[in-house]
Curated annotation (Swiss-Prot):
SUPFAM superfamilies: Elongation factor Ts (EF-Ts), dimerisation domain, UBA-like. Associates with the EF-Tu.GDP complex and induces the exchange of GDP to GTP. It remains bound to the aminoacyl-tRNA.EF-Tu.GTP complex up to the GTP hydrolysis stage on the ribosome. It is found in: Cytoplasm. Residues 82-85 are annotated as: Involved in Mg(2+) ion dislocation from EF-Tu. Keywords: Cytoplasm, Elongation factor, Protein biosynthesis. The keyword Lyase does not apply. This is Elongation factor Ts. The keyword Protein biosynthesis applies. One of its GO terms (molecular function) is translation elongation factor activity. InterPro entries: EF-Ts_dimer_sf (IPR036402), Transl_elong_EFTs/EF1B (IPR001816), Transl_elong_EFTs/EF1B_dimer (IPR014039), Transl_elong_Ts_CS (IPR018101), UBA-like_sf (IPR009060). The gene is tsf.
């Protein structure tokens, strides 16, 4: 039987919202086959998110957040399946938390798949050159690059970022949790972040740090 890897467990958890131990057990039961593992979890009633993947989430809200005298602004579209859920305080607070995350952590993309291939290759080339300059053997450089590129994803992709209020969870973890708790499919559809004077040479001001302070009040 093929050994189940941590990466497989993580992927299954992201796709189903099931617990880590349940995901590991499912993969072991089916010899590491991802599709069969999803079916296994669904049969056991443990795949909260997988059941809702095919459902349409066309309701929701557009959350607008403006920080510190108009110096940072965020617009976020958060979708759910019904207007009833969209109007609940819990859903609105979740949208607020995600908007604050965007203001503080400066993601440029929603998911890994949204990063342009040219930018990804450029980043990999830089990381490869860094590893070689550090004197690392060429045969292990590519593995090192793959490891380090995950840090890049965490910096630029919202769903991969650690939640500022609880660094033990990623934003994707939060979406899965909220989906399981509410019982509806929850989707971060899109977002835009503005920072006053962005792209203009100016005195350094860490507006993002100010947002983080506000989140932790």
């Amino acid at each position: 039987m093929a050994e189940v890897t941590a990466a497989q467990v993580k992927e299954l958890r992201e796709r189903t919202g099931a617990g880590m131990m349940d995901c590991k057990k499912a993969l072991n039961e089916v010899g590491g086959n991802m599709d069969k593992a999803i079916d296994f979890l669904r049969e056991k009633g443990l795949a909260a998110a997988a059941k809702k993947e095919g459902r349409i989430a066309a309701e929701g809200i557009v959350e607008a957040y403006i920080h510190g005298g108009g110096r940072i602004g965020v617009m976020l579209e958060l979708n759910c399946e019904t207007d009833f859920v969209a109007n609940t305080d819990g859903f609105k607070q979740f949208a607020r938390d995600i908007a604050l995350q965007i203001a503080a952590a400066k993601p440029r993309y929603l998911a890994k798949a949204d990063v342009p291939e040219e930018e990804l290759e450029h980043e990999k080339n830089i990381l490869r050159a860094q590893a070689l300059n550090e004197g690392k053997p060429e045969k292990i450089v590519d593995k090192m690059v793959e490891g380090r590129i995950s840090k890049f994803y965490k910096e630029v992709c919202l769903l991969e970022q650690e939640f500022v209020k609880d660094p033990d969870k990623t934003i994707n973890d939060l979406v899965l949790e909220k989906t399981a708790k509410i019982g509806e499919r929850i989707v971060i559809r899109r977002f835009t972040r503005y920072e006053m004077g962005e792209g203009i040479e100016k005195r350094e001001e860490d507006f993002a740090a100010e947002v983080m302070k506000e989140m932790n009040r």
